[in-house]
Amino acid sequence: MLTRRQLHTSRGDIKLEVFCESVPKTAENFLALCASDYYNGSPFHRLIPNFMVQTGSPASDPKSKASATIYDTPNQLFEDEIRPALRHNSRGIVSMANKGVNSNGSQFFITFAPAPHLDGKNTVFGKVLEGTEVLDELEKLEVDKKSRPKEKVEIKSVTMHANPLAG
């Protein structure tokens, strides 16, 4: 089953395909957070040209590095779903940001270029279908010494697109 979400950002829309069957726990967490409006107002808080842009922190605190999940675990994090077939092999790969093994929450990133050094370390759960021009704009943003965009760019909202081929 293909599931599509559209990130409506302050720079334009990015349509994503989420790999529900390949990484069900990661997909369920992402989709549930989208449905609960968790990502609304979430800033793109880390940007490294030729690498990636990261988002998914709570909108209430733009400087927060916090993360949340739908899973009732002691640390509010969940395990990796590393799949050898899902790789960081192109621009527009959507993957979980983490702080090490089995430390996934709400934060994720979109690659600007292949990042094979992340294969086996970060869970790939989707890819960009449309909106590469928005990625182009994001990648050109000026950043500070800590790789934070100097201009505020955020996810305004997320919408679902039904798959007309689903049964």
Name every feature range the model reports, one short phrase each.
Residues M1-G167:
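Cyclophilin-like peptidyl-prolyl cis-trans isomerases
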